[in-house]
Amino acid sequence: MYYMLIGFIIVVIAVIGAGYILKRKHYQRINELEEKKIKLRERPVIDELSKVKKLKLTGQTEALFESWRSSWDEIETRLFPDLEEVLLEAEMNTDRYKFRSATNAENDIEQMLVVIEKQMDQILGGLKELLISEEKNAKESRATKEKFAELRREVLTRGFKLGETLPYVEAKLNELSESLNSYDSLTDQGDHLEAREIVIVVQKEMQVIEAQMERIPSLLHETDTILPEEMNKLRAGYEEMVRKGYYLAQMELDKEISRMKNQIDKMKKNVINLDLDEAEQGVEELHNEIDLFYDTLEHEAEARHFVKENHSPTSDKLQRQNAVSDALAEQITEVKQTYHVAEDDLAVYLKTSAKLSEAKENFEQLTTLIASGEIAYSAAQDTLKEIDAALITISAEQDKFAEELRSLRKDELEARDDAERMRRAIITLDRKMERERLPGLPEEYLSLREHMGESIDTLEKRLEEKPLNMKAVSQDWRIAEEDLIHLTEKAEEMMENVRLVEHVIQYANRYRLRNKELADELVQAENHFYNDYQYKKALEIAVTALEKVETGAFKKVEKAYASKVSVDDIE
């Protein structure tokens, strides 16, 4: 019982202590909010309103002032009283230990203080701007009026440089003068904010006019003097070149100059209407056009030099290529008496011949036009370059065809010599096989030997045809060469097999009397070797039989054969 009482007392003390601590924290927060409220109340809103109220206000300025004063009245009559009530509520809830309710009230107070502070900032900021704008307007209006007076004086002293734009500039200045009068009127009436807007607009407009007055004289100088002079110089240069024999009708300069004059008139209207950006763009574009015409004239002068330098050499090239083409035609006629010339090959010559005729015709037409002065030198230059390029192609194609014709005789002689060489190669191969003293030749080899002879016969027969078809000769020639290679390979293989069979049987004889199976298989191998001449099969049977008796024996025999060691010396 005693311990229960002690525990209860401890709990009560803890609760009272916790309540005291929480209560203290809430009072601390309420005091902070109270201090913030007092600081807001001390802000000089009423003093600033009184200062502005002393000014003479009208229009937009008066409406703004009334809105600020109405906003302050709302703060004084509603927002601050509401704030006091919520502060009192927070204190009462704290005294009664209603800490949750106290916290809610404190949060509401913070939000209310934010609203009041924001509203007061707007009022004070607006009042300050109004007071500053009055002072700033006074300073800037003086500077603006002085600048305006300078512009007026400049127009009076330099107006002659503005040409036909002068009335438009003066009209702009008159509009600004009226705006400045409106500024004075609004200032006298107390509408300082609207007056300030007018000052800002006038300042910007004066900057625009000042910049325009700087640009107008140079643009008028371009449209009235520089561009017309450039066009006159261009026309003079054009006419001088025409007198010297240049054909320049393709430029249509009279039409183009008329068009450019219309462009100048349009640019001048743009300047008078103060559309200076478009005028400047037009001036730049027209200068570029004139430069292009000069480039064209310069190109014609360069082209004339090229034509005079290259006309005769091109004529010489044409004559030389004509001579080459005629000689090639004679060569074709001669070759066709001996050799068959394919239609495709003749088509190549006919095509190049047609190209040459076209180039010759184009050159003759060009020469006539140059003599009569009816072609621009630039066009003549292009035509000469095209003819020269065509002649280079024609020359290469005809040289290639001529070389192919010359190679026909060379290829014929080589084919005849090679046919003889292949016959000698067969005889040499036959003698080599005779020296080997083979038991006989198998049917397969005899068939290849016969086919080889027929291939050479076919080639030699083809070489006797008139006219000689070298494409067919080349085909028969290739077949004969392939057959000779195949026959030689077969002969070498057969002789190799014969030597190996003899070595294997000779080595196997050491086991022949002791091994009946080996002896029987060796007899079978010998039958193939001596009777039907199947040397490869005989080798396979003999090797298989020997390997059954002595594994690896064939490798030893092969090694001894390659090293030219006697079979009897193999261990």
From Swiss-Prot:
Task: Please list the coiled coil stretches.
Answer: 102-147, 248-298, 326-374, 400-437, 478-529
Q: Name one GO cellular component term.
A: septin ring
Transmembrane region positions? 4-22
Which Pfam family, any one, appears in the UniProt record? Answer: EzrA
Membrane protein topology class = Single-pass membrane protein
InterPro entries named among the record's database cross-references = EzrA (IPR010379)
Q: Where does this one sit in the cell?
A: Cell membrane
HAMAP family cross-referenced by the UniProt entry? EzrA
The segments annotated as topological domain Extracellular are: 1-3
Tell me the Gene Ontology biological-process terms attached to this UniProt entry: division septum assembly; septin ring assembly
Taxonomy-wise, where does this protein's organism fall, top ranks first? Bacteria, Bacillati, Bacillota, Bacilli, Bacillales
Specify the protein name. Answer: Septation ring formation regulator EzrA
Residues assigned to the Cytoplasmic compartment are 23-571
The record's comment on protein family reads: Belongs to the EzrA family.
The protein's job, in short, is: Negative regulator of FtsZ ring formation; modulates the frequency and position of FtsZ ring formation. Inhibits FtsZ ring formation at polar sites. Interacts either with FtsZ or with one of its binding partners to promote depolymerization.
Keyword annotations: Cell cycle, Cell division, Cell membrane, Coiled coil, Membrane, Septation, Transmembrane, Transmembrane helix
